[in-house]
Amino acid sequence: MTEMRSAKIMSGRVFAGARALYRAAGVSGDDMGKKPIIAIANSFDEFLPGHVHLNKVGRIVSEAIREAGGIPREFNTMAVDDGIAMGHTGMLYSLPSRDIIADTVEYQCNAHCADALICIPNCDKVVPGMLMAALRLNIPTVFVSGGPMEAGTTVLADGTVKSTDLIDVMYATADDNVSDEELLNYEKTVCPTCGSCAGMFTANSMNCLTEAIGLALPGNGTILASHSYRKDLFKRAAKQVVKIAHQYYDDSDDSVLPRSIATKEAFENAMTMDVAMGGSTNTVLHILAMAQSADVDFTLDDIERISHTVPCICKASPSGKWEISDVHRAGGITGILGELDRAGKLHTNVHSIDYPTLEAKLADWDIMRPTCTEEAQQMYKAAPGHIISPEPWTHTTLFDSLDRDRTNGAIHDINHPEIHEGGLAVLRGNLAPDGCVVKTAGVPPEIWKFRGPALVVDSQEQAIEVILNDTLKPGMALVIRYEGPKGGPGMQEMLYPTSFVKGKGIGKQVAMLTDGRYSGGSSGLAIGHMAPEAANKGPVALIKNGDIIDIDIEARSVNVELTDEQLDERRRELEAGDGYVAHRNRHVSQALKAYAAFARSADKGATRDPELINKLSGLD
């Protein structure tokens, strides 16, 4: 038996005051010291459609925990909507919020002696922030996200009915052929329900990754927020966290702890799945940060190794025609994992919050196996309801059948891949000696090799300007620098630039490179996370207009056609002048300066530098 963390304050004269406060907050004296305190880390927020319904989720989870024999204690953390923050200085705050969210959850759980944790995230930085906290705390933890939004249904001016999502309205913004009336039609129809944005963007990628790593139940990444089955998932997750809390404290079973689940092998499985489904490049940042929180030796080199050996077998929006509901119908994350298992790409001896091995889980939840349960087959039939409403659980609509077509369906088998290369790739060269990342699933085959002159800007705002005023021409490589973790600061996303080049009709004719990052909704030849970043004296700071940029995705290379001697000469010139300073007007708040002071480059997950923190604090 392992003593509950809350035991220290639930008995003895010294902590009578703490117990008095717990009583005042609604905890029964009869439960104190007998039932585990389950912290509910919610992220309800009326700014985000992905989080607007989470207050209701929190109530469901709380009641289910109480019924299962736990003491639920709900609290809230922040949530930044990247789509709303996009394209202006609000985006500087998005990535830094990840680390603050992690701190918030750690502070709350440790300050109040929580015995276990259930996390209710949904959107981009909330999921990894809570994952980082769970791995730091290492107490019994279950994740259950709010669920993805349904895709929109938009009737175009010519009468065509099109499946749409948020990215479509952003493309339309820069398309001179789209009238204001048509743009308003997109605006009203592309986001029809609550939930995280409908494609395989960052939020859904991270929720899928959480399921793959073993900290969430099947369906977490793909059951729509609007479907009644999502409500069932919340109840099951709540009961599961109480169950594993008892396993740990009553039976001393530490296999249920996050660090026991999220091992090196589990990280490799999660990244293998991510590469196979062509997830957001942001997942690279977040999985590196998570590994550091778990003290797991998983680096960009591991991601590079995996990307060479795993093909892309699922191309969802924005890289392909499938929406998240289509991926769900094809078996969801266990469907993708099942195909990877048959190809020998997974460690199936890893365990999760609900199964002793991945192999056992796939036996029950992989729709291609004869042993797949009726419960699983029914769950994966959950379909869109096409009811425009911010309310969750509005329908019980089911598909007539499952998508088991592994040649032309939403999920392919390993013998019929969408792309023989993985959906994500790490590139290196004299422009990014420490690496950079590209979502190969979203790059048209004709520009996997690219050579062209650079057009250099020092901010996203400048990038948008040169795109919209047609300074960026076909054949050019747009280099956006000083947007890294330290240089931005905050490493903002470049969704507007990638969307606007598509709106201008040159998405297949230009390259884009940045030490910042891209939205999960970005596609095209968009290379991000260049490391070292410009503000850390990276070579990207030395590039000038007209320099020839050479990119070869198959060879995993990204270079500028300059000799080492020429680069050294430019470095001397730069350091004799202004130095590594962006030429732009941007106010940077004290909060962002604090982030910049400790931020590491993207190849380290853009996390705070632990060595610098230890040095300055004087604490081990």
From Swiss-Prot:
It catalyses: (2R)-2,3-dihydroxy-3-methylbutanoate = 3-methyl-2-oxobutanoate + H2O; (2R,3R)-2,3-dihydroxy-3-methylpentanoate = (S)-3-methyl-2-oxopentanoate + H2O. The active site is at residue 519. One of its GO terms (cellular component) is cytosol. The modification N6-carboxylysine is found at residue 125. It comes from the Bacteria. Keywords: 2Fe-2S, Amino-acid biosynthesis, Branched-chain amino acid biosynthesis, Iron, Iron-sulfur, Lyase, Magnesium, Metal-binding. GO terms for biological process: isoleucine biosynthetic process; L-valine biosynthetic process. The keyword Amino-acid biosynthesis applies. Pathway: Amino-acid biosynthesis; L-isoleucine biosynthesis; L-isoleucine from 2-oxobutanoate: step 3/4; Amino-acid biosynthesis; L-valine biosynthesis; L-valine from pyruvate: step 3/4. Pfam families: ILV_EDD_C, ILVD_EDD_N. Homodimer. This is Dihydroxy-acid dehydratase. It comes from Bifidobacterium longum (strain NCC 2705).
